């Protein structure tokens, strides 16, 4: 296996524990796996070199293409491509499979066991216009928890370990879209914590089904509708946990 970027504190452990271990169990030899994360649109020289010289059955794990701008012609040189961020333009490619964003390092390890929830719903994240609309819709729904930071990866954001405690104590976790794509780390972190992600449709579609398949999420038409659906579970949290 080779890597072209430091997977650091973000989805590094998710990749190693789930994705790469599955490849190792299924294929036996990871010498043909390349994990790539970068900002440039064109494939890096290392990807091109890897695709040219490594033998057949090469696997590319492509991260970081949040704005769906990376050139993907190189995909045809790999037997299998796993990538973050669903792109409908790649649906026809039989060698391309979607990966969720995974979780940050503090959410690594076994999933939380089911327990009584301290919060019916929670949200921890940065302040944005669409999130203000979301929180306004949930303002009248009691037993919620909200923590707003000044920005993504900012000095005042919660420590991941503290965020995990909040999610583990929440029946539902509100999961608005990220900066440029519907998917965020928050979705898998909620699942890893034993909570139910609450999402809304994008352009009238449940975009998460293209990555997660038949998932257990709350999928609403808008945030007002989402609040109504969550409110319906207020007096039956065990049913919500069983979703």
Regions found by a protein language model. Give the residues of each.
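Alpha-helix N-cap recognition
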Residues: 219-225
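Nucleotide-sugar donor-binding catalytic core of glycosyltransferases
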Residues: 1-215, 219, 237-240
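Conserved donor-nucleotide binding/catalytic region of nucleotide-linked donor-dependent transferases
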Residues: 228-243
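An acidic, carboxylate-rich microenvironment
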Residues: 162, 225-228
């Amino acid at each position: 296996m080779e890597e072209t970027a430091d997977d650091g504190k973000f989805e590094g452990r998710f990749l190693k524990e789930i994705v790469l271990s599955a490849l190792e169990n299924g294929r036996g030899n990871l010498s043909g796996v390349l994990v790539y994360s970068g900002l440039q649109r064109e494939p890096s020289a290392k990807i091109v070199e890897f695709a040219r010289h490594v033998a057949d059955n090469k696997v590319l794990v492509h991260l970081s293409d949040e704005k769906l701008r990376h050139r993907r012609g190189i995909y045809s040189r790999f037997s299998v491509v796993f990538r973050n961020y669903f792109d409908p333009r790649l649906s026809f490619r039989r060698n391309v499979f979607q990966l969720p964003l995974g979780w940050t390092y503090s959410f690594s390890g076994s999933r939380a066991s089911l327990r009584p929830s301290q919060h019916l719903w929670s949200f921890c994240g940065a302040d944005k216009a669409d999130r203000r609309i979301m929180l306004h819709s949930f303002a009248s729904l009691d037993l919620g928890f909200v923590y707003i930071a000044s920005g993504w990866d900012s000095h005042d954001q919660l420590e991941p370990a503290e965020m995990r405690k909040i999610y583990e104590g929440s029946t539902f976790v509100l999961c608005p879209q990220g900066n440029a794509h519907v998917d965020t780390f928050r979705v898998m972190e909620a699942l890893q914590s034993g909570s139910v992600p609450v999402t809304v449709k994008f352009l009238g579609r449940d975009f998460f089904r293209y990555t997660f398949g038949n998932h257990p999420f709350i999928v609403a038409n808008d945030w007002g509708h989402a609040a109504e659906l969550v409110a319906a579970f207020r007096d039956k949290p065990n049913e919500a946990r069983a979703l």
